[in-house]
Amino acid sequence: MKLQRGDVVFLRFPFSDGTGSKVRPAVVVQSDRDNQRLESTIVVSITGNTRLVGKEPGHILVDVNTPEGKAAGLRFTSAVNTHGLFTLHTKLIEEHVGQLSPRLMAAVDAELRASLGL
């Protein structure tokens, strides 16, 4: 599967304690250059829990009732969680469902810079 930065995908996400995994949505944040040459990619998680949006840094709302939310391909309004940053083998990606808009990706980038101190 050819990945691009900003792709919304469903993948087998490992539990933080390493005991298993569950299919979850995520956003590809790795550069297109590296997505072309590597068998792994860097993603941030997406959660259905939106209660921290606007209250805590690192959470960006994806409202499925908006055109850009629909383009993301999610089933319900969700939050991108930039604290859920993972490097995963691309074999774990099960489905490509959409793309984040440039505006949402700019918000993700800003939160990643803040989280990583860049």
Ranges and model annotations:
Residues 1-118:
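Conserved functional hotspots at enzyme active or ligand-binding sites that engage polyanionic ligands
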